[in-house]
């Protein structure tokens, strides 16, 4: 081993490479044959007679296990029935269960559902009628009668409306004039309407004429209300003026 440990270092003082370590490991295995005892005392040791003993499981709770074994030897433990079997109605069931079933059926047949009663209020013809302890069956009968009566009244009302409508339509047809002659009469009576395009052209002319009339009236008013008369001044300006000193010469 001393030679092997000494060879682990090179002469130069450097660490060996991976290939060198592998070669040295193979050389060591060839010399020694194995790595030694690596089982750490966990291998099965053979008995004195030469046979190997099978490994046994470690008992973590030895006290409880021994108590369970002793109680199991003394008494047989019976499992509890959490869901007991119900009595079936098959032929294998006992006669007692059949009798019980028949008794239950008879009692259910004999017992009738009690009719529930409550106060009933009816609004009819502008009146209010209140009945105490009115059974549900009678209330249903009253509702059925009301539905039948409402259906009959509705059919009668619709028939009357249809008859009145037909009679009114016949009267209108009889009172109305001949529909063929009416368009000719209306066309003759109605005046001929002018073309809207011609009206649009005539409107500016009428406005222009009315504007001229308005301006003429305003012109007359302006001339009459002026502080001096325009016509007189024009005549005076047209006549020559002869001063007195010119006439003396």
UniProtKB/Swiss-Prot annotation:
The record's subunit annotation is: Homo- and heterodimer. Interacts with COI1, MYC2, MYC3, MYC4, AFPH2/NINJA, TIFY10A/JAZ1, TIFY6B/JAZ3, TIFY11A/JAZ5, TIFY11B/JAZ6, TIFY5A/JAZ8, TIFY7/JAZ9, TIFY9/JAZ10, TIFY3A/JAZ11 and TIFY3B/JAZ12. Interacts with RHD6 and RSL1.
As for family, the record states: Belongs to the TIFY/JAZ family.
Q: Which residues form the Tify domain?
A: 113-148
What gene is it encoded by?
A: TIFY10B
**Post-translational modification remark:** (Microbial infection) Acetylated by Pseudomonas syringae HopZ1a. Ubiquitinated. Targeted for degradation by the SCF(COI1) E3 ubiquitin ligase-proteasome pathway during jasmonate signaling.
Residue pairs linked by disulfide bridges in the UniProt entry: none
Q: In which tissues is this gene expressed?
A: Expressed in cotyledons, hypocotyls, roots, sepals, petal vascular tissue and stigmas of developing flowers. Expressed in stamen filaments after jasmonic acid treatment.
- Main subcellular localization, coarse class? nucleus
* PROSITE patterns recorded: TIFY
Question: Where on this chain is Jas (motif)?
Answer: 204-229
The record's GO molecular-function terms, alphabetically, read: identical protein binding
Cellular component per GO?
Answer: nucleus
Q: Which domain of life is it from?
A: Eukaryota
Organism placement in taxonomy: Eukaryota, Viridiplantae, Streptophyta, Embryophyta, Tracheophyta
**Name listed for the protein in its UniProt record:** Protein TIFY 10B
What is this protein's function? Repressor of jasmonate responses. Jasmonoyl-isoleucine (JA-Ile) specifically promotes COI1-TIFY10B/JAZ2 interaction. Activated by MYC2, MYC3 and MYC4 transcription factors. Interacts with and suppresses RHD6 and RSL1 transcription factor activities to negatively regulate jasmonate-stimulated root hair development.
User: What is the native source organism of this protein?
Assistant: Arabidopsis thaliana
Triggers of expression:
(Microbial infection) Triggered to degradation by the pathogenic Pseudomonas syringae HopZ1a protein in a COI1-dependent manner, thereby activating host jasmonate signaling. Up-regulated by jasmonate, wounding and herbivory.
């Amino acid at each position: 081993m001393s030679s092997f440990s000494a060879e682990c270092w090179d002469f130069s003082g450097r660490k060996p490479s991976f290939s060198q370590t592998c070669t040295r490991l193979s050389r060591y295995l060839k010399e020694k044959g194995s790595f030694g005892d690596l089982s750490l005392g966990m291998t099965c040791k053979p008995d004195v007679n030469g046979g190997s003993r099978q490994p046994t499981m470690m008992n973590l709770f030895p006290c409880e296990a021994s108590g369970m074994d002793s109680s199991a030897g003394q008494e047989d433990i019976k499992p509890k029935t959490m869901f007991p079997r119900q009595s079936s109605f098959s032929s294998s069931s006992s006669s007692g269960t059949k009798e019980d079933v028949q008794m239950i059926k008879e009692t259910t047949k004999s017992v009738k559902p009690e009719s529930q009663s409550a106060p009933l209020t009816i609004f009819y013809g502008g009146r209010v009628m209140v009945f105490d302890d009115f059974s549900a069956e009678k209330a249903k009968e009253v509702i059925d009668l009301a539905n039948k009566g409402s259906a009959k009244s509705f059919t009668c009302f619709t028939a009357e409306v249809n008859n009145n409508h037909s009679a009114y339509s016949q009267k209108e047809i009889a009172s109305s004039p001949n529909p063929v002659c009416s368009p000719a009469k209306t066309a003759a009576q109605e005046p001929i309407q002018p073309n809207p395009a011609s009206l649009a052209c005539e409107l500016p002319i009428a406005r222009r004429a009315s504007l001229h009339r308005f301006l003429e009236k305003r012109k007359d008013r302006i001339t009459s209300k002026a502080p001096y008369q325009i016509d007189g001044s024009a005549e005076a300006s047209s006549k020559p003026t002869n001063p007195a000193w010119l006439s003396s010469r």
